[in-house]
Amino acid sequence: MTTRRHRTRTAALAAGALLLLSACGHKARGTDLLQEGLLVEATLSSGRDLAWVRTQMGRQYRINDVVLRTLPAPPPSRLRFHVDVPARGHLTFAYGIPPEHHDGTPVEFVVNVARGGKEEQAWSQMLDPLGKPAHRRWQHADVDLARFAGRGVDVVLETRGYEKSDDARRALWGIPALTVDGAQAPLAIVYLVDTLRADHTQPYGYGRDTTPELLKFAGEGVVFEQAISHAAWTKPSVGSLFTSLLPGRHRAVQLRDQLDPGLITIGEMLQAKGFTTGAAVANSVIYAEGTGFEQGFDQFSGLHGAGDRPSKVVEAAGVVDEALRILETRRGMPTFLYVHTMDPHVPYTPPAPWDAKYEPHASAEHPATDPRSDYHQPADRDRLVGQYDGEIAYGDAEFGRFVRELKARGLYDRAIVVFLGDHGEEFLEHGAFTHGKSVFDELIHVPLLVKFPKGRHAGRRVAQQVQVADVLPTVLEALELPVPAPPAIVGHPLQAVLDGDVPEGPVLSEISHRGFVAHGMRTSRDKYVRRFSPDDDELYFDLKADPAEKQNRAEANRERVRLLRAGVEAAMVPNPFRTTLRVAGGGEYVLRLRTGGWIEGVQAVGLGAAENYTIEGNGRKLEVHLRPKPGQPREVSFGIRPMGAPVFLEGRRDGQPLKPEMVWIAHEGVHPAEVPLKLPELEPVDEDKDRLLVDMLNPPPADRAGVQVWLQMAGGRTAPTNMSKERCESFKALGYLGASFDCSNLK
């Protein structure tokens, strides 16, 4: 797999892949106007020329959490495209004014069509974001060009303003395309329901009627009975979905992590093959700025809740509406669509009548919306499950509406449609609620159903264990596109599983999230789990005899545990963060570190003959002997696997125990409350009331005498994104930050 090019990649990836066919031919397809060569003339007020505009074509721009590929159009400007307009042709596009210019004067957007030396205005609209709040987001338009059908037509996108602008991003056109009613083109859809555990759906044997629409869909597709997610919360799971890589490889593991921009996602793979790519996403963990999941998408719509802000309550109806709108704007074009609803996620607030569908019902005294606040007695668990199931039933109804609309538009039969969950939800099966805390089956066993084009394999059920990483190669195979070979990806096309050509393999799942660190390796018959924090233990379950994972049989199966443990450790990717200790100011130090994981890659700088370090306890303990001199500090750095495993520090200086004032943490140089201490992590756990340690990746001032502690990125890695106040508040609303967490001091 090659490294991806500049993040704001242009439409040149698709050059030549989509040809505009005869205007009257029955095989005419839609055309992306951002293709190289279609733009023939550009006049911009900023003085930029055609060559410059072509370098900007396709750069992504975000307005109100909707990211589009764009064209710069500072008024006055004219962008001329030479095209053939097909019969039944439409021009679809977005247009908008970036937030930094919402206090400026209005801008008029105009579409002109020129043919035979005569230019005619086909559409216009004035945007005034200062006076009209509704204009502070992307606007969308669909212009019927049927009367201009034929060859040799010029489409001119023009902007006019009350004042000339030299800012190239003063106004923007987004994703302009010629679309064709009734044209046939390949279509791939991945429809993900956040927080949906497999055993609460009817195709997987649930006793309640939560998913009648999914049950119908199962009859038209294939049910994969043992589909396993690679993580127990959204970001790493969707990262594996988009890249077909394990979480440690794609690097979107913890809350502030960014999907590794050096990787190529499913969107980028398909975009390079001439597909238009769109997404409608309800979870801000995926669409927030800086997460990186929008790479490879022509349009990536983050859906807001009440108050037009990121919210924990974004109902599926709005997501489905946006998904259908995206399909409508790309008619007749090869299309990949990602849909991400999140109704089963806390809080459990299904709309009527689904809020009263299952007993025992919630009430004012027992609201049953969030187990973190509403669980007080055993009966509350049943109420919470009832509301969770109500959310599933509501979301299922919307999925049914989506499928019916695909059929009504004539899109369903030729499409590959993948339905899945990203992770599950727990209700005290192993002593906890919600998700992101372990890798037990209630969290990693997800529904996975695939409707193949032309009804192939309809009605089949597959017992062989598969994984979320298999979705990407399955989509490519269904579209008859090349499938990368391992190790570029870890997944296999599910078509090969159906044909019996792929033997069943184990699946790795891992979690390193807000103080919970664990990983596991699962086969269809057994499972190994290693927990590092807050529990520190090793578990083994016989899934045939104990599918609920209640009986730890590790002692009785030591050889099997050894084999699975070795498999996990071989698959784990090195931690990109390195813990660094700098000792300065003179004195004799003995520092002892221990971890629930294992220490690796120790590097020491400046050590003299009498200074050394030793590793003991099978890699779990590190002892360092240092004698720094004034002006001659010593540094020792090391990695910890898995990422997030706790590290504890204690030690002595000149024979006396270390005191808190001798230890300096990160850029602020704060002192711990006590020694021994648990070394700080990049992000806090539930009960942490302090702000995020944004500066953990910067060292304390070098002149501080004592032990200085901070984190460094391993070579070639980029630091995680600093969290904005808005992003912090949306993550807090979703429950990924504790209720007492303070976002007010962030920008």
Pin down the residues of each PLM region.
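Bacterial N-terminal signal peptides that target proteins for export
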Residues: 2-13
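Catalytic domains that recognize anionic headgroups
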Residues: 23-67, 72-747
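Accessible peptide chain termini
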Residues: 1-2, 737
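Bacterial N-terminal signal peptides
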Residues: 12-22
